[in-house]
Structures are given as C-alpha cells and as structure tokens.
Amino acid sequence: MSTDQNKEVVILWLEERDKGNWDIINELFAPDYVYHLASDPEPVRGRDKVKQINVNFRFAFDIYPTHKPDLLVAEGDMVVYRETVRAKPKDPFRGQPPTKKEATVANIDIYRILDGKIVEQWNHPDMFGLMKQLGNLPTPGGGGS
C-alpha cells in the first residue's frame, strides 16, 4: 500500500473511533494487533483489547472529537499521528476520582500498517499533563508522606 493509503486507514480509524463505532475494529485491525502504551512495560495483544482500551477511556471521559490531526506523517509502513484532545473526566481513571475539570493534552500515536490493517501501535499520551490539569498530582511542598 502507498503511504497515502496507510494514512487513510489511520484517519478512518480515528473518525470512527470518535463516533464510537467499535465494529470498525474488525475491519481495520489485524487479529494479532500489538498495542504499546508508553507508560506500560508490556504490550497488549489482540483486537478485543483495542476495543476494551478505547471503550474504557471513552467511558471515563467526556471526549470532544478531535480527528483532525495536528501532524500526520507517513513513511513506508509507518504512520505518525499527533492530535490535541480535550477531555473531562466523568468516572474514575487510573485510580483517580473524577475531578470534572477539563484538560487539553497532546497525544502521539505511531501506527504500523500491513496490507491495509493496523498491526501495531505505539501510544504516547501526555499523561503527566493530563493528571496535572485534572489536579491529580501532589502539590510540591504540600506535605504528605
């Protein structure tokens, strides 16, 4: 596939993700898909995990759709996508209670495409920026243990 076709696969996924169309996962992701999250040492494998990760995030946050990229670059079988996401927590996330504060954070994904399917993804969200904006980080000099 061409780099433009690979970009189209990623854009289609993100547009459908923002609509909550999880059925598209079976069409766009390889059965043996591998997901790498920057903060987790072990990758997650399988299409069912794609859905679980995305549904959990969408369940925890009100997300304002952002499928317009800040950056979209492709070379060979790789596509790099950067987006700015606005979100407000509505349920607990990573052990933190919802603060109802809105956050705007950058997210960078690197996708590997093979034969029109997403086979691997590296996700690099600005988790520090997210937690800071939500007030879920300890204040320096604020005491504590």
What spans do the regions from the language model cover?
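C-terminal and inter-domain tail/linker signature
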Residues: 1-145
